C-alpha cells in the first residue's frame, strides 16, 4: 500500500467549498494542496495558494498538474472520467474513475445498485417522448423524470402527477436522455457516510436524518430517530458492497429513503458530502480529515459522535446574514466559505 506522508502535495479537482474543506483538513495534517479548476478562483483559493486554471478536457494541463502533486482527489462528480484516466497515467487518483462512471449516470447507478441486491424506486430509461409515455404506463404517473446526467440539488428534474404531464416534463428537462423513477412512499430521508481506506478498512459515521427544502439539503441531524436506526444496518451493508465493488478509497455517501419496505437507495456521491458537514465538530474525526487519511494511505480516525446530539443547518442565500445571531449560542460552530451564489 502506497503511503503519502505529511509534507506531500494533494491535488484537488475543483475549487469550491468541498475542495476548501478538504484543503483545511489536509493542512491540519501537514499536507500542501494544489487546486485544478476551470474557474480562476473560488472558495478553496482562500486556503490553498496553489491554483491551476485549466479545463478538465485539457490533457496537457492535467498531465502537468498530476506531475506536480503526489495524489489527486476530486470534490464533485461531474468530471469526465477520461480526465481522471489521464491523471491516473501519471500517478495516484483516489477515488478512481469507475466511481465517477457509475455515480454520474443515474441509470448506470441504479442498475449497479440493483445488481448488488439493493432496493431502488422502480425506474425506466427514457430517450424519447414515446419512451416516457411507455414508462408512465409501466411505472405509473406519480413519478419523477430526471436527466441522466448533471442533475443536483433538484435541478434537471420534473414531477409527474398524471399521464398528461409527460409532454410538459419531457420539455422541462430539455428533451434529453433521462430516467423515470416511480414515486417512493417514505417517512424520512437519511444518508450512510463511510470512509474506505486503501487497505480496504471501512468506518461509518452515524447516519443523519436529512431534511430537504426545494431539493436542497436544509438540515442533517444525528443520531437519527428509531425508524432510521432500524434500517441503518441494512443500508450500511449495501454501502459497503458498493465501496468494495468499486475498490473505493476515500469518503463515499449513499442517500436513502426510510420506507415501510426498508431502506430505498436514492443516489450516491463519490466524495465528501454536505450531509456529513456536521462531522467537523460533531464527530471524533471529520469526513474531510478521514478522506485525506484514506487517500494518503494513513490509518483511519474514529468516527463516533463527539456530542450526544448534533445538527447541521445549511445556510442558503440570505441565511448567512444571521451569522451574529448564530454565534450568540456558544454551542454553535459557524462555517462560512465565501460562496457568492
Where are these regions (language model features)?
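Glycine-rich active-site loop/lid that clamps phosphate-bearing ligands
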Residues: 306-309, 313-341
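Active-site nucleotide/adenylate-binding loops and adjacent lid/helix of ATP-dependent enzymes
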Residues: 102-191, 195-242
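Protein kinase-like catalytic core scaffold
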Residues: 203, 263-267
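Active-site "cap" helix and flanking loop/linker of ATP-utilizing ligase/carboxylase catalytic domains
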Residues: 233-254, 259, 269-320
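Short amphipathic beta-strand starts and helix->beta connectors
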Residues: 34-36, 140, 296-299, 328-341
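Short, low-complexity Ser/Thr-rich regulatory SLiMs
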Residues: 194-198, 256-260, 338
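ATP-binding N-terminal substructure of ATP-dependent carboxylate-amine bond-forming enzymes
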Residues: 1-111, 115, 130
Amino acid at each position: 500500500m502506497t503511503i503519502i506522508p505529511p509534507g506531500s502535495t494533494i491535488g484537488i479537482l475543483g475549487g469550491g467549498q468541498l475542495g476548501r474543506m478538504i484543503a483545511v483538513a489536509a493542512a491540519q495534517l501537514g499536507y500542501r494542496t494544489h487546486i485544478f479548476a476551470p474557474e480562476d478562483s473560488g472558495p478553496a483559493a482562500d486556503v490553498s495558494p496553489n491554483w491551476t486554471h485549466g479545463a478538465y478536457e485539457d490533457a496537457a494541463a492535467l498531465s502537468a498538474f498530476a506531475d506536480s502533486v503526489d495524489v489527486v482527489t476530486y470534490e464533485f462528480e461531474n468530471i469526465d472520467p477520461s480526465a481522471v484516466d489521464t491523471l491516473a497515467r501519471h500517478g495516484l487518483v483516489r477515488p478512481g474513475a469507475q466511481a465517477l462512471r457509475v455515480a454520474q449516470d443515474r441509470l448506470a447507478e441504479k442498475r449497479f445498485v440493483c445488481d448488488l441486491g439493493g432496493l431502488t424506486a422502480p425506474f425506466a430509461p427514457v430517450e424519447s417522448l414515446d419512451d416516457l409515455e411507455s414508462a408512465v404506463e409501466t411505472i405509473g404517473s406519480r413519478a419523477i423524470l430526471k436527466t441522466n446526467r448533471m442533475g443536483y440539488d433538484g435541478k434537471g428534474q420534473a414531477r409527474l402527477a398524471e399521464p398528461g404531464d409527460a409532454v410538459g416534463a419531457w420539455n422541462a428537462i430539455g428533451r434529453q436522455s433521462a430516467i423515470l423513477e416511480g414515486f417512493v412512499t417514505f417517512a424520512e430521508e437519511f444518508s450512510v457516510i463511510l470512509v474506505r481506506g486503501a487497505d480496504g478498512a471501512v468506518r461509518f459515521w452515524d447516519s443523519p436524518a436529512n431534511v430537504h427544502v426545494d431539493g436542497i439539503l436544509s438540515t442533517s441531524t444525528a443520531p437519527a430517530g428509531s425508524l432510521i436506526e432500524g434500517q441503518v444496518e441494512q443500508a450500511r451493508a449495501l454501502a459497503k458492497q458498493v465501496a468494495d465493488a468499486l475498490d473505493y478509497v476515500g469518503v463515499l455517501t449513499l442517500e436513502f429513503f426510510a420506507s415501510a419496505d426498508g431502506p430505498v437507495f436514492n443516489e450516491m456521491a463519490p466524495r465528501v458530502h454536505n450531509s456529513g458537514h456536521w462531522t467537523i465538530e460533531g464527530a471524533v474525526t471529520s469526513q474531510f480529515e478521514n478522506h485525506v487519511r484514506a487517500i494518503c494511505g494513513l490509518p483511519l480516525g474514529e468516527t463516533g459522535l463527539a456530542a450526544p446530539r448534533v445538527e447541521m443547518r445549511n445556510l442558503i442565500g440570505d441565511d448567512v446574514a444571521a451569522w451574529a445571531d448564530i454565534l450568540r449560542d456558544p454551542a454553535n460552530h459557524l462555517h462560512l466559505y465565501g460562496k457568492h451564489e
